[in-house]
């Protein structure tokens, strides 16, 4: 993959009942980024989400449910001719402790339905993922209620700190300095 990020999407489910849940930490990331950049996210039905143009890149918060996120990402990417390798998806990651944040280049969906749908709609898995740790409930049967509930206060604080760490590296992501981002996040 080459070039910098031209589209940053933050995954989550729409509606107030999901806004503070673990599954929405990608949306938390995107909303915080928009606030820091003084950008207002405007609803764009043709992109199935809230959108803002921020210098040389787009911000996208899908209005679809998580498992249909690919509609929004693919619609905006195709309209603006953004390649999968120029896309960054911020999402919740069960396999990392709350407070961990890592950048991944390409790969599978790892059981994440939002990523699965994005891969399906883009026809490619060659996009970047900003994986924000939320902990694992311990057993697969508890995953759905776990991700659809708010984190504990300690986990919420750790998740917000991870988001801040990721936000500080947006300039490097936009410039395409992915190795520097990985060094910063993974050390």
UniProtKB/Swiss-Prot annotation:
EC nos: 3.1.1.29
One example GO MF annotation: tRNA binding
Main location: cytoplasm
Coiled coil: none
Positions marked as site (Stabilizes the basic form of H active site to accept a proton): 92
Oligomeric form and interacting partners: Monomer.
UniProt family annotation: Belongs to the PTH family.
Identification of the protein by name: Peptidyl-tRNA hydrolase
């Amino acid at each position: 993959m080459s070039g910098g990020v031209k589209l940053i999407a933050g995954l989550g489910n729409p509606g107030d009942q999901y806004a503070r849940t673990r599954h929405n930490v990608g949306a938390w990331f995107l909303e915080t980024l928009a606030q820091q950049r003084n950008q207002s996210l405007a609803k764009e039905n043709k992109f199935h989400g809230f959108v803002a143009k921020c210098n040389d890149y787009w911000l996208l918060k899908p209005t679809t449910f998580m498992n249909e996120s690919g509609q929004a990402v693919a619609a905006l990417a195709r309209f603006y001719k953004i390649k999968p390798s120029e896309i960054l998806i911020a999402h919740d990651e069960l396999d990392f402790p709350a407070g961990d944040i890592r950048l991944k280049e390409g790969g599978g969906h790892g059981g994440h339905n939002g990523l699965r749908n994005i891969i399906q709609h883009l026809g490619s898995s060659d996009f970047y993922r900003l994986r924000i740790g939320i902990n694992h409930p311990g057993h697969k049967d508890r995953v759905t209620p776990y991700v659809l509930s708010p984190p504990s206060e300690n986990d919420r604080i750790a998740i917000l700190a991870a988001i801040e760490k990721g936000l500080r590296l947006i300039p490097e992501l936009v410039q395409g300095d992915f190795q520097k981002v990985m060094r910063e996040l993974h050390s």
